[in-house]
Amino acid sequence: MAKRAVQHADLKAVPMLLNESLYVGIDIGKAKHVAGFLSKTLLERHERFEACPALVFENSREGFRLLIERIRSLAPLEHIFVLMERTGHYHRTLEQYLQELDITVYVMHVQSRSTGMLKTDKRDALTLANQLYNQLELGVQVPNKLQLIRRVVPPTQAAAELRGLIRHRYELIHESTRRKNKLTAICDELFPELVRVVKDPNGQVALALRERFPTPAALATVSLTTLQQIRGGARSISSAKLLELQRQAAQSIGIKEVARLRGLVLEQTQLIKELQMLQEHIQQLDKEIGGIVEHAREGQILLSFPGIGPIMAATSIAAIGSIHNFPSAAALKSYFGWAPVVAQSGSTLDHTRLTHGGARTMKHMLFLAVFQAIRLKDNEWARLYERLVKTKCPFDERTQSYLGKTRVIGRVAGQMTEAIYALLKRDAELLSKVPPSQDPPPPLLYDPEVHRQHRLGHYRPLKSTPPPNTITLLHPFPAQ
């Protein structure tokens, strides 16, 4: 009879790799994930990274605990480095769980796979672990920037709140635009003469008239007093325009077929209600977003810039996440899509243009911010724009105007991005030095006077002046 194994309650599992780092690559799935483990010892033992151990675990709390138990059996948690591939939103829960345990997490935009027949989740996970091992342990450089790993920095509280709200607002705006396009198409069939009197057929007063009187015949027979009551206090449509609208409705060439007319009227009524509901939700979101931006330190900094409003500031905060994600102002400009690209061959400089990459939303938002600052006139950004236009843009004698003014906006947007980065970076460094029990000082806002002094040549850096370099002479030891 075989002897039963003696169990010792005082024995504890000791990690295999106590003094070396463990690199974990995780292939993300919807229901299950696959983790591959790689280290210098494991690579020497198995000779190939494809033969290193792997673990399949579920996308649940029990699965996450199983992963942590397996990791602890191999190495301490402070020696763990995890790499995941961005795949939609499925990686976010695991990323948050690992960061709560103070595990260093890296992400990669897309994984480069060899063109072969073999494609398994285990191989993908071990390939990610090998990428992490090569770039962190061996310092291997990769020519493709999409293959670079990037450490995940938790977003600020304001960025975490605004990310979902800004994304939802963008979707509501998109749906609202779709409804407006459909309503415009219906108006072209039912009452094409409406746009001759009313500039926007989807305006508030126009929608109220179209909802109350969906056909030109119904609009032509109503009294002027009723139309004035529907118009309310809005003066965008005068009484004369209302009379002209009735005259156009009486002789409208809109569709008259009864079957088609009933379908268009029903569709128009439903679309108007959907559009009004979407606009109401957008107003609620704007109010919530404005409150978050006003109370956030990053929001106060961004709102101090001329031309930047609450929605622009909220979009910037949500896109940046944490300013520690960007090591320099050039990285932030590249992410915003306002970095210059130089085409050069030898000693010849062919041309310089703006990069085609970057976040499209941020590129659009920053363009609007610069354009609004230029329209305000009385600020340093507008003066910089006017000076650059006279310097960089050719003057057309025939039209007596400068050509290519929009190209100068890229230069102004780049400098505004640098100023935003400097203030956000300084504020983040200031907060990192404040003890938890102490209230932080107010943030340093954009100061037009300091900006004007900078442009005049009196530059004052935001960082404290480093101590001057000194040379200390060491006297030789006396001869014994």
Where would I find each of the regions flagged by the language model?
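A detector of single, family-specific signature residues
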Residues: 1-480
